[in-house]
Structure formats: structure tokens, C-alpha cells
């Protein structure tokens, strides 16, 4: 009987409208994206970058740990040995369409060569533009070196 009275007096509709009015006058939580941007966490995983040492030499020692640990198999590395016995990469490609941004490559790297930077706006109209070669990754690293170094410094105690 009580259910009949509730449905007769449209109790559920009034209750729903009250809830709507409650949230209607609260401040909005959305942002106008292209013009406003929300703050990014220091642990954000965005576009990849290869870092260099202060003297300009690339950090990557071609150990291929990032290639081995990548669950999406998005990283391809080819390396040559130099005269002094050390190895350096001749090819370092990341297919960003395969990448799942898990950060395992960054965690596996013993010299902090591959990192995920602060950029999340790198959409493209072609598939080939999302296959990053070594030069593009090094350019990303040069562009964001200050931000990457401070991010790694903040995160150091958790690694």
C-alpha cells in the first residue's frame, strides 16, 4: 500500500529533482580544457624522452632492459660497440600507438636515460608521426631536461 502511495504522489520524481537542485547550485568541477589546464601530478606519465649527460653525451648505454620489459613491445633498440668498449644505440624507436604508458621502461633503466615527460598533447593525424625515433626522443629530452630532472629528484626516495 505504501509503495502505491509513493508512486501515486510521484515521490521518486520529487526526490530526484531535489537531488538535481542540490547539485545545480554547487560550484562546477569541470574546466574549459583548451583555455584552462588542471595541474599535473609529479608522477604523471606522458610523452617519452631520452636524456643526456651535462657534457651532451646521451645517457642510454644500450642495455636493452627497457626493450625487454616493455609489455606492449613498443620499443626497438639496435646498438653498436664503440672503440672504448662501451655500447651506444644506433636505433631507438618507440611506437607510441603501442605504448600503454605503464612506466616500466623508466623503472628498468639503470641510468635514467628513458623517462616519461610532462607533455600529454601530442596527438597526430598519421600513424608514422607517432613512431618516435632516437632524434625526436633526444629533442624531447633536451626540451624538458629541467622538468625531468626535478621530477626524478622528487621521485628519488620512492624508487
From Swiss-Prot:
The keyword RNA-binding does not apply. GO terms for cellular component: plasma membrane. Binds 2 [4Fe-4S] clusters per subunit. It is found in: Cell inner membrane. It catalyses: a quinone + NADH + 5 H(+)(in) = a quinol + NAD(+) + 4 H(+)(out). Residues 51-80, 90-119 form the 4Fe-4S ferredoxin-type domain. Belongs to the complex I 23 kDa subunit family. NDH-1 shuttles electrons from NADH, via FMN and iron-sulfur (Fe-S) centers, to quinones in the respiratory chain. The immediate electron acceptor for the enzyme in this species is believed to be ubiquinone. Couples the redox reaction to proton translocation (for every two electrons transferred, four hydrogen ions are translocated across the cytoplasmic membrane), and thus conserves the redox energy in a proton gradient. This is NADH-quinone oxidoreductase subunit I.
Amino acid at each position: 500500500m505504501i509503495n502505491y502511495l509513493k508512486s501515486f504522489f510521484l515521490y521518486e520524481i520529487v526526490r530526484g529533482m531535489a537531488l538535481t537542485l542540490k547539485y545545480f547550485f554547487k560550484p562546477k568541477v569541470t574546466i574549459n580544457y583548451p583555455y584552462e589546464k588542471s595541474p599535473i601530478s609529479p608522477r604523471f606519465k606522458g610523452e617519452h624522452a631520452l636524456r643526456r649527460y651535462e657534457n651532451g653525451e646521451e645517457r642510454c648505454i644500450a642495455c636493452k632492459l627497457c626493450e625487454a620489459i616493455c609489455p606492449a613491445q613498443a620499443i626497438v633498440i639496435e646498438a653498436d660497440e664503440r672503440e672504448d668498449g662501451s655500447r651506444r644505440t644506433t636505433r631507438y624507436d618507440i611506437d607510441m600507438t603501442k605504448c600503454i604508458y605503464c612506466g616500466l621502461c623508466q623503472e628498468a633503466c639503470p641510468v635514467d636515460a628513458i623517462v616519461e615527460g610532462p607533455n600529454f598533447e601530442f596527438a597526430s593525424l598519421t600513424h608514422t608521426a607517432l613512431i618516435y625515433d632516437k632524434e625526436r626522443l633526444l629533442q624531447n629530452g633536451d626540451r624538458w631536461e629541467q622538468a625531468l630532472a626535478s621530477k626524478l629528484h622528487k621521485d628519488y626516495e620512492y624508487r
